Each structure stands twice: as C-alpha cells, then as structure tokens.
Amino acid sequence: MAVVPKRKTSKQRKALRRSHHALEALTLVECKNCKQSIVPHQACKYCGFYKDKKVIKVALNDQVK
C-alpha cells in the first residue's frame, strides 16, 4: 500500500512550489549578417553564420508557404 500524506497541502505551499513553473520569454538578437531575429549563441538558420564565419550550409527555399 502507498503512503498517505499526514497533512493537507495548503494553497500557499502549493503556490510557492509552483512559482518557478512559469514560462520565460525567448531572448532574441539580430543576426549581424542577415539582420534576422535569432537565438543568441547559435548559428543563424537563415544565413549559416556564427561569429562572422560561415559554419553551416543553408539550402535556399524560394517557395512561399
């Protein structure tokens, strides 16, 4: 058999425990090469540059969705 809680968890204790569960807004910066919004410390998925160097090949997608 499972263990049963000794006392009821109060609303305040529940709220304090869940206070760290909120979602944070994503931090975005402008790419120095193509001026698109990107996540910092990652290669740009639009042009493939990171720290002024081409690090990944990016396929051109001319189709408009």
Swiss-Prot record:
Gene Ontology MF term list: structural constituent of ribosome
Gene Ontology BP annotations: translation
Example of a GO cellular component annotation carried by this entry: large ribosomal subunit
Domain of life: Bacteria
Alphabetical keyword list: Ribonucleoprotein, Ribosomal protein
Classification via Pfam families: Ribosomal_L32p
Record family assignment: Belongs to the bacterial ribosomal protein bL32 family.
Protein name in the entry: Large ribosomal subunit protein bL32
Annotated source species: Metamycoplasma arthritidis (strain 158L3-1)
